[in-house]
Each structure stands twice: as C-alpha cells, then as structure tokens.
C-alpha cells in the first residue's frame, strides 16, 4: 500500500528534477548587470537628493505644529 502512495510522489519529484532550472534561476548576464550599474547609481542619487531636499520642509511643518500646540497648551488649575 505504501508503495502505491509513494509512486506518484516519486514521479512528480523526478519530473521536477529533470526539468532543469527555471529561467529566473538561470545564470545572470554579468555584462548586462555591469551596464546597469551607472543607471542604478544615478536613480539612487536622485532619490537621495529628493529625500534630503524634503527634510527642511518636513522639519518646518513639525516645528510649526509643535509651536501651535505649545501656544494652545493650558495648565489646568487645581
């Protein structure tokens, strides 16, 4: 009985092994990777520049809201 249950499993495993690697698992194209490095670095630099340019505005908004909160703060009288 066990042999009958294991035969389909064995067939599926053998088919998977004999099929070979999937295209996503194939060897990467090293030359293409090296060609894409400058574009990736430029995109990273642009993203970093945008992030740093938004820091002063975000800080200004945070400080303004904090100052408004302090203006409206009342100490309760007991």
UniProtKB/Swiss-Prot annotation:
The keyword Glycoprotein does not apply. GO terms for cellular component: high-density lipoprotein particle; very-low-density lipoprotein particle. One of its GO terms (molecular function) is phospholipase inhibitor activity. Residues 1-26 form the signal peptide. InterPro entries: ApoC-I. GO terms for biological process: lipid transport; lipoprotein metabolic process; negative regulation of cholesterol transport; negative regulation of lipid catabolic process; negative regulation of very-low-density lipoprotein particle clearance; triglyceride metabolic process; very-low-density lipoprotein particle clearance. Keywords: Lipid transport, Secreted, Signal, Transport, VLDL. It is found in: Secreted. PANTHER family: APOLIPOPROTEIN C-I. Belongs to the apolipoprotein C1 family. Inhibitor of lipoprotein binding to the low density lipoprotein (LDL) receptor, LDL receptor-related protein, and very low density lipoprotein (VLDL) receptor. Associates with high density lipoproteins (HDL) and the triacylglycerol-rich lipoproteins in the plasma and makes up about 10% of the protein of the VLDL and 2% of that of HDL. Appears to interfere directly with fatty acid uptake and is also the major plasma inhibitor of cholesteryl ester transfer protein (CETP). Binds free fatty acids and reduces their intracellular esterification. This is Apolipoprotein C-I. The gene is APOC1.
């Amino acid at each position: 009985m066990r042999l009958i249950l294991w035969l389909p499993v064995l067939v599926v495993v053998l088919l998977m092994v004999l099929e070979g690697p999937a295209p996503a698992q194939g060897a990467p194209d090293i030359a293409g990777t090296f060609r894409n490095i400058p574009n990736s670095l430029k995109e990273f630099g642009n993203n970093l520049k945008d992030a740093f340019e938004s820091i002063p505005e975000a800080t200004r908004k945070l400080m303004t809201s904090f100052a408004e909160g302090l203006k409206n703060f009342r100490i309760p009288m007991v």
